[in-house]
Amino acid sequence: GGGGGGGGGGGGYAEKTFAVTPSTNYGYVIGTGGTGVSGAGGNNGTSSTFTVGGVTVSALFGSGAPVATAATTLTARAGGVGGLSTSGDMNGAGENGTPGVVLIVATPIVCSGKGGSSLYGREGAGLVAVGNGNAALGYGTGGGGAATGASTVRTGGNGMPGIIIVDEYA
């Protein structure tokens, strides 16, 4: 048997226009990417936020995919859920990670899921052979799932951190 882990979810997207006061400090947090864990479900990322006055715009984290254990029958493992966003003028969800699968023919074939993408880059690709998951390649994207053998423990790919872009208009 073997196991194909799902990919991690991508982070959400938010866009907001604020009227601001020059020389004023504003609060922000840039979210971290989730991390792959050897032999366990992936860790969630953290949210990116930007606060002006009483309004906090949040691009929420993508979740890690659950652990994929060895299977001897046709099996699918869920990918992580993409993050949502709140309080933006435009709010978008991160893409869900795709599931990993185990196909049973003469010998098991394992395929891991790709991570969820974002507007700012490419996710970690899925695998079609036993190996550790691929790391994400763009801001706010999820890592690819690991593909395991019958007794081999593997680690999912890491997600990428979020990004905050501030455009100033006069």
Map each language-model feature to its residues:
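Glycine-rich strand-loop-strand elements at beta-sheet edges
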Residues: 1-52, 143-166
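A generic short-segment signal for beta-strand/edge and adjacent turn/coil regions
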Residues: 18, 28, 128-136
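Acidic, glycine-rich loop-and-strand cores that form catalytic or ligand-binding grooves
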Residues: 53-134
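Short FAD-binding loop at a beta-strand-to-alpha-helix junction that anchors the flavin cofactor
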Residues: 138-142
